[in-house]
Structures are given as C-alpha cells and as structure tokens.
Amino acid sequence: MKTFVLHIFIFALVAFASASRDSAKKIGSQYDNYATCLTEHSLTEDDIFSIGEVSSGQHKTNHEETELHKNGCVMQCMLEKDGLMSGADYDEEKMREDYIKETGAQPGDQRIEALNACMHETKDMEDKCDKSLLLVACVLAAEAVLADSNEGA
C-alpha cells in the first residue's frame, strides 16, 4: 500500500512539474520560426509573454498596449510563415489541420470547437498583430479551461 501511495505521489509531482514547466514557456517558442520572428521584430525572448500568463489572461493587465501589440506581431509572423495567415486573414482550414496534427485532436474534440470559436471571435479584427495575439490567447485560455474540467472529471 505504501508503494502504491508513493507511486501516486510521484505521478502527481511529475504532472505538476510538467504543467508548471509548460506554463513558464514563452508563447510560440516551440515553433521553427520563433527566433526568426523575434529578430524581425527586434525583440528578445524576455519580451515575450509566458504561456501561463496568456492562458490566465494576466498578460492583459500586466503589460502596456505596445507590449501586447509586439507580442501579437511575433505571433502573426509565425502564423504567416507557416502559411496559416496572410496579412490579417486566416486560412481557417489549414489552421484546423495544423491544430489537429499538433494536438492529436479527433473530430468532435472540444479543443477543435474552441479553435473554431476563437477564429470566429477574432475574424473581423483588422489589425493583424492584435488579432493574432487575441487568437492565441483565446485558444490557450480554452485549452486551460478544458484541461481543468478534464482533471475534475
């Protein structure tokens, strides 16, 4: 019994450490064009918001509008270089395909529904940088809510 409890404790600790590590990562840092887009926009990794900050919405209250815009421009740069955006326009089908490939989501998965809702919510925005950050923030927040609801189930 002690061994079983120890295994559960270790599993919980590893899961918590993994979630904490992911939330500390910078948004977009896992993608190929991250460094290129930082350079193109004269930013450093220190200028970019963390996943945890964005998924919780803290980036909106902790930073100035110019910082929000710059982060959005880096996101838009990466989306455009990956063929998911052209200017301020999404390629919605390609965005869904890439998201499914990246997350392993299956048809009917709530994450795909969240992506669709986020694209719909932001589709009429004209500023490509603000639009990109809002899309990323919307998806990350939805994923966090879904992860929390799945943990409670």
From Swiss-Prot:
GO term, biological process aspect, one: response to pheromone
Alphabetical keyword list: Behavior, Disulfide bond, Pheromone response, Pheromone-binding, Secreted, Signal, Transport
Gene3D superfamilies xrefs: Pheromone/general odorant binding protein domain
Pfam families the UniProt entry points to: PBP_GOBP
Signal peptide span: 1-19
GO cellular component: extracellular space
MF GO annotations: pheromone binding
Disulfide bonds: C37-C77, C73-C129, C118-C138
Keyword Disulfide bond among UniProt keywords: yes
Subcellular location: Secreted
Secreted as UniProt keyword: yes
Main location: secreted
Similarity field: Belongs to the PBP/GOBP family.
Its job: Colony queen number, a major feature of social organization, is associated with worker genotype for Gp-9. Colonies are headed by either a single reproductive queen (monogyne form) or multiple queens (polygyne form). Differences in worker Gp-9 genotypes between social forms may cause differences in workers' abilities to recognize queens and regulate their numbers.
Quaternary assembly: Homodimer.
Name of the protein this chain belongs to: Pheromone-binding protein Gp-9
Organism (species): Solenopsis n. sp. (strain JP-2002) (Fire ant)
Taxonomic classification: Eukaryota, Metazoa, Ecdysozoa, Arthropoda, Hexapoda
